[in-house]
């Protein structure tokens, strides 16, 4: 969960910064934002650019945000077990050994991130290591390794890029119409109105688009649960999810939230990056 929220937050920040830059370019160069083909190309460049910048930064930002400590050389039996388990599961699914890190948190959680299947990160909380049995922790690790093997981070990036493109395009298209009507008597667009309307619409459309990205995130969680069940057995995966039902609510942020094993509760399931635990457990029982 922490993974997704960090990705989304970083992506939003990058897109907003690029949006400001784009508006400045319009103002300085005198380019007309009304050209649909040019606007669409520009929206795609900035939309996908924001997503891929977020993806490339995800590993370092995730470690920094949680204060994760990378295991270079295992110092105790728990770290040995953690490295051996991730290594074995990675070999089973055919990916390179991820960087493994531990971060200090009472939450029972873990997340994976990274731009490449063979250059990724798996991080687990001290709360998970202290409160889960080895079988349960093994299932959680299998869930995260499955996210990496399935290329979920890249797929999420592509989806976010498409969403960003349409958000930028629609907001500027509508803003151009509003600005033109507002200043029709002067025969030109009111750039201040254009800037203001486009920025507000980006925030509104970005929020609405989050329903799409959260739907995909929930869909991906079911697949990661099923793949983890195939790796370690569905009873271990069910036991891990049952443990999460009585755990603390996680405090992961942004993009990391989406790729964690456990997600925050929301007022509506439509805004949740993870399906309700009961639904995930029921899905596993029906396998």
Curated annotation (Swiss-Prot):
Residues holding Zn(2+): 143, 147, 221
Membrane topology designation: Multi-pass membrane protein
- InterPro entries this protein is in? HtpX_protease (IPR050083), Pept_M48_protease_HtpX (IPR022919), Peptidase_M48 (IPR001915)
Q: What is its main location?
A: membrane
Q: Does the keyword Membrane apply?
A: yes
Q: Please give the Gene3D superfamilies that the UniProt record associates with this protein.
A: Metalloproteases ('zincins'), catalytic domain
Catalytic center residues: 144
Name the enzyme group at the top EC level: hydrolase
Q: Which cofactors does this protein require?
A: Zn(2+)
Q: What's the Enzyme Commission number for this chain? A: 3.4.24.-
Q: What is this protein called?
A: Protease HtpX
* Primary gene name: htpX
């Amino acid at each position: 969960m922490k993974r997704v929220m960090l990705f989304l937050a970083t992506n939003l920040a990058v897109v907003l910064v690029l949006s400001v830059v784009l508006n400045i370019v319009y103002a300085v160069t005198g380019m007309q934002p009304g050209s649909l083909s040019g606007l669409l190309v520009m929206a795609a460049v900035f939309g996908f650019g924001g997503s891929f910048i977020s993806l490339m930064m995800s590993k370092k930002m995730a470690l920094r945000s949680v204060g994760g400590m990378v295991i270079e050389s295992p110092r105790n039996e728990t770290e040995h077990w953690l490295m051996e388990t991730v290594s074995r599961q990675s070999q089973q699914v055919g990916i390179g050994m991820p960087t493994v890190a531990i971060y200090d948190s009472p939450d029972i959680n873990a997340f994976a991130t990274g731009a490449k299947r063979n250059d990724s990160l798996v991080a687990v909380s001290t709360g998970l290591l202290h409160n889960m049995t080895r079988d349960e922790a093994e299932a959680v690790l299998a869930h995260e390794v499955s996210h990496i093997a399935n290329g979920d981070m890249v797929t999420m990036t592509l989806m976010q890029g498409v969403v960003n493109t349409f958000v930028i395009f629609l907001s500027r298209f509508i803003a151009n119409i509003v600005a033109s009507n507002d200043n029709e008597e002067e025969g030109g667009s009111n750039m201040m109105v254009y800037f203001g309307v486009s920025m507000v619409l980006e925030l509104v459309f970005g929020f609405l688009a989050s329903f799409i990205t959260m739907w995909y995130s929930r869909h991906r969680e079911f697949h990661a649960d099923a793949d983890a069940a195939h790796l370690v057995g569905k009873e271990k995966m069910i036991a891990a999810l049952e443990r999460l039902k009585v755990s603390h609510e996680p405090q992961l942020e942004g993009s990391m939230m989406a790729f964690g094993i456990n997600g925050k509760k929301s007022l509506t399931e439509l805004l949740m990056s993870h399906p309700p635990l009961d639904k995930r457990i029921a899905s596993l029982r029906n396998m």
